[in-house]
């Protein structure tokens, strides 16, 4: 049984830029500021056997603000700083109606199929309603970091915490559920 922690990127692993109350991705590697407790919190999860997989919407690719190469370079930078096993990227915008853009669970399902992950034994950590809904739709337990920017949530998180360290503590204290495997 492979367990995973799926992580949103912007606002969870690196600083999100909030403008008019909404979070935005950094535009350059120089703006990629890794949150202070990320490396230690993720190392603890990794030591306990969790696969660490980033699941990130990057609509600036579809909008023409960033190229896939620029986004990949930022992801490579993040991966050089943190113990990540994979980074799943949705390059689409809402109007593309794809299956991978959170709140749809496509990024999580794709990684679960490829990595043999038991979604019922896994977690999604995010800072927005999209992350929580994607996690619930995939069959994962969910953790909201922060206040969700005042957004309305259709699905409530299993835990609402302030930091990635608190999220790691909570995840590591959750029991392994029995007979609830979610085959992919």
Predicted segment positions?
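Active-site neighborhood of HAD-like aspartate-dependent phosphohydrolases
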Residues: 1-51
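Non-catalytic pre-domain segments flanking phosphatase-related domains
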Residues: 1-9, 17, 85, 169-184
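Substrate-recognition element of Asp-dependent hydrolases with the DxDx(T/V) motif
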Residues: 38-71, 75, 84-96, 135
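Short, electropositive alpha-helical surface patch
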Residues: 61-79, 102-114
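Structural recognition of alpha->loop->beta junctions
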Residues: 74-89, 94, 153-173
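Conserved Lys-Pro-Asp/Glu-containing loop-to-beta segment of HAD-superfamily phosphomonoesterases
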Residues: 99-130
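Acidic, Mg2+-coordinating phosphoryl-transfer loop and its flanking beta/alpha structural elements
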Residues: 125-162
């Amino acid at each position: 049984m492979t367990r995973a922690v799926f992580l949103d990127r912007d606002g969870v692993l690196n600083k999100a830029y909030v403008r008019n109350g909404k979070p935005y991705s950094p535009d350059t590697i120089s703006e990629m500021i890794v949150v202070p407790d990320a490396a230690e919190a993720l190392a603890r999860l990794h030591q306990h056997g969790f696969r660490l997989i980033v699941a990130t919407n990057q609509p600036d690719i579809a909008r023409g603000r960033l190229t896939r190469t620029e986004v990949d370079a930022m992801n490579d930078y993040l991966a050089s700083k943190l113990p990540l096993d994979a980074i799943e990227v949705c390059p689409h915008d809402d109007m593309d109606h794809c299956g991978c853009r959170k709140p749809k669970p496509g990024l999580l399902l794709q990684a679960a199929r490829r990595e043999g992950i038991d979604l019922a034994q896994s977690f999604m950590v995010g800072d927005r309603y999209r992350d929580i809904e994607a996690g619930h739709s995939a069959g994962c337990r969910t953790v909201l970091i922060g206040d969700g920017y005042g957004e309305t949530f259709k699905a409530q998180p299993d835990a609402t915490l302030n930091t990635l360290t608190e999220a790691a503590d909570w995840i590591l204290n959750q029991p392994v559920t029995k007979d609830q495997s979610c085959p992919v």
